[in-house]
């Protein structure tokens, strides 16, 4: 799931992804957060 959250580092995606899909598994891709629900 790509969410509308700008990022420079994967760690910046942890909280937004936790809020969005309840999972900390994420990656910063092309300046946007990508969340994985493991």
Curated annotation (Swiss-Prot):
<feature type="disulfide bond">
    <location>
        <begin position="7"/>
        <end position="28"/>
    </location>
</feature>
<keyword id="KW-1220">Voltage-gated potassium channel impairing toxin</keyword>
<comment type="similarity">
    <text>Belongs to the short scorpion toxin superfamily. Potassium channel inhibitor family. Alpha-KTx 02 subfamily.</text>
</comment>
<keyword id="KW-0632">Potassium channel impairing toxin</keyword>
<dbReference type="InterPro" id="IPR036574">
    <property type="entry name" value="Scorpion_toxin-like_sf"/>
</dbReference>
<protein>
    <recommendedName>
        <fullName>Potassium channel toxin alpha-KTx 2.4</fullName>
    </recommendedName>
</protein>
<keyword id="KW-0964">Secreted</keyword>
<dbReference type="Pfam" id="PF00451">
    <property type="entry name" value="Toxin_2"/>
</dbReference>
<dbReference type="InterPro" id="IPR001947">
    <property type="entry name" value="Scorpion_toxinS_K_inh"/>
</dbReference>
<dbReference type="GO" id="GO:0015459">
    <property type="term" value="F:potassium channel regulator activity"/>
</dbReference>
<dbReference type="GO" id="GO:0008200">
    <property type="term" value="F:ion channel inhibitor activity"/>
</dbReference>
<keyword id="KW-0800">Toxin</keyword>
<dbReference type="GO" id="GO:0090729">
    <property type="term" value="F:toxin activity"/>
</dbReference>
<feature type="disulfide bond">
    <location>
        <begin position="17"/>
        <end position="35"/>
    </location>
</feature>
<keyword id="KW-0872">Ion channel impairing toxin</keyword>
<feature type="site" description="Aromatic residue of the functional dyad">
    <location>
        <position position="36"/>
    </location>
</feature>
<keyword id="KW-0528">Neurotoxin</keyword>
<comment type="function">
    <text>Blocks voltage-gated non-inactivating potassium channels (Kv) and unblocks inactivating potassium channels blocked by alpha-dendrotoxin in synaptosomes. It is not toxic to mice and crustaceans, but has a paralysing effect on crickets.</text>
</comment>
<dbReference type="GO" id="GO:0005576">
    <property type="term" value="C:extracellular region"/>
</dbReference>
<feature type="site" description="Basic residue of the functional dyad">
    <location>
        <position position="27"/>
    </location>
</feature>
<feature type="disulfide bond">
    <location>
        <begin position="13"/>
        <end position="33"/>
    </location>
</feature>
<keyword id="KW-1015">Disulfide bond</keyword>
């Amino acid at each position: 799931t790509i969410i509308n959250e700008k990022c420079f580092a994967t760690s910046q995606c942890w909280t937004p992804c936790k809020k969005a899909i309840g999972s900390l598994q994420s990656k910063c891709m092309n300046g946007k957060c990508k969340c994985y629900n493991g």
